[in-house]
Amino acid sequence: VTSETKFDRRNPMGPARDLGLAELREHAMELRRTMMRMASDKGEGYIAQGLGIADMMAVVFNRELIYDPQNPEWPDRDRFVLSTGHYSIALYAALYRAGYLPEEQLDRFGLNGSELALSTFDDVPGVEITGGSLGHGLGQAVGMALGHRLDANDARVICELSDGELQEGSVWESAMVASNFKLDRLTAIVDCNGIQADGPMVINIEPVADKWIAFGWETVEVDGNNIKEIVAAFDRLREANGRPKAIILRTTPGKGIPTLERRERAHFVRVGQDEWDKLHAELEENYV
């Protein structure tokens, strides 16, 4: 999809690209392979979170978003805001697969002087905000959506954030503003994987979906590792007008690699090369 096709780009009753579930699952697998390559070259990283949201990223970048990798600053592009900047490996993999990034940059991921840092920077083509300090992505996404409205631009803004991040009060201030202004071109995707830096979540934020509903958001909760459910959530929310939208994703950190799925301290993975080789093999063995 390029900027030359923008005048027939908005079909409110359908996706940007109508890919089937099998194609989307293959895209998700390729994202996981790409992330594993990047993490094993580095020897460490936030790989578990990236694997957990791979299915969502496959749907968003291959079915939902309108963008032009040859023109990253195209004003009419849909915007994907990664609030959890440490999930950068997932976004870089998606941008590479979408044609934004050259392959050689993947091999330098996270190294000193690399274009692709462990946390996102907005000087990378396709990266909309600089990440790092949590709790700020949704507010920036709200600002983008308001700016689009002022410009009579019907582009969408999709913001990914995490369950741990919901402990930040700024998230709920932003949610309140979005509801007040009826920003129905804004979608929040909340990755609920149950982990924080040192292990499981330390503050109970449940019921997550009910909170977003109470703030006036049209909300759907799904299995975040089930592509069929993710697609159905986007299709259902597409018909909701006059309210911002939220998808609550229940994901498994390390999805697709049983060793990582069972790892309690999965926030930051650091293992030897032999174990990386085993993890690569597990990923291929568990692909169905």
Mark where each language-model region is.
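Thiamine diphosphate
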Residues: 126, 130-241
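Structural motif
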Residues: 43-51
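Glycine-rich beta-alpha junction loops
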Residues: 55, 86-87, 193-194, 226, ...
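N-terminal capping segment at the start of a domain
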Residues: 28-44, 191-192
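Glycine/aspartate-rich loop-and-adjacent alpha/beta segment that forms the canonical ThDP
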Residues: 4-7, 227-288
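Short secondary-structure boundary/capping segments
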Residues: 98, 204, 261-265
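Cofactor-binding active-site loop characterized by glycine-rich and histidine/acidic residues
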Residues: 38, 51-180
